[in-house]
Amino acid sequence: MKKGIALLLATLMCLSLTACGGTGEQSSGQDSSGEDTAAPDYPTTNISCIIPYGAGGTMDQLSRALFQSLSEDALPSNVNFVVENVAGGGGLVGTEQGLTRAADGYTIVRVNGDLIINRAIGATDIVLREDFTPIVCLQDEPYCLIGPADGDCSTLEGFINKLSSGDNAVTVAITGLGSPGGLATIALSNAFGCQIRTVTYDSSNDCALAVVTGECDATFINVSGVAGQIEAGTLKRLDFTSAEESDSLPETPYLAQTYPEE
């Protein structure tokens, strides 16, 4: 059991990148006949930025900070990035909406590891490198299992004890069963032989809030997404889904340490 939980959960990392929707025709360089063509001015109008999760989550906050900086430093004064939060389906609703837009460089979509996982489990036919043009990787970090500041699940031992007490004894907040947090929850369920009740929310911020208010016992979330709440004492970090210690929260145990291979 311990070996299985360490190996599976340690693979759940947040890979987050920005991509352009679709693969369109050439817009500069050479035309279909091979002759040189002049590159059009770009951009001349606002650029839509689809974030496939609700406002306030880790991806939303990071994206807005990035786009604001780029708007100020890299775009003409009459052009801005316009953020659109399109939540649902563990990120699939917004991602699929991005594919319906023209492949003209005026729509970009934030995607993360959820898309790859959803593809692997058959929830979508989207192939990242075929249906999108990746631009840049923005984030690569482990997930953190967090619990409330007080109560039965405020420590890893307490959470595991409650989990092991019977089916549906704990409730975990997730953004979708195909998300890293959803898979981590399934891994815990399989490892301990107990059913875990899950509640799906539109964003990681909503998941964290559900733990604070007591709606859920715990959630798996990006490390950077809860650093402020942990520092403020409203949430507690229980463990990392990582094979090594995190630089951002070095005092938190990691799963390969808590559950070493046997």
Indicate residue ranges for each PLM-predicted region.
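Short, high-confidence coil segments that cap the C-terminus of an alpha-helix
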Residues: D167-N168, C216, L235
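N-terminal (or domain-start) structured segment
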Residues: D31-E130, C194-A218, Q229
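Short beta-strand segments
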Residues: V109-V111, V172-I174, F220, D239
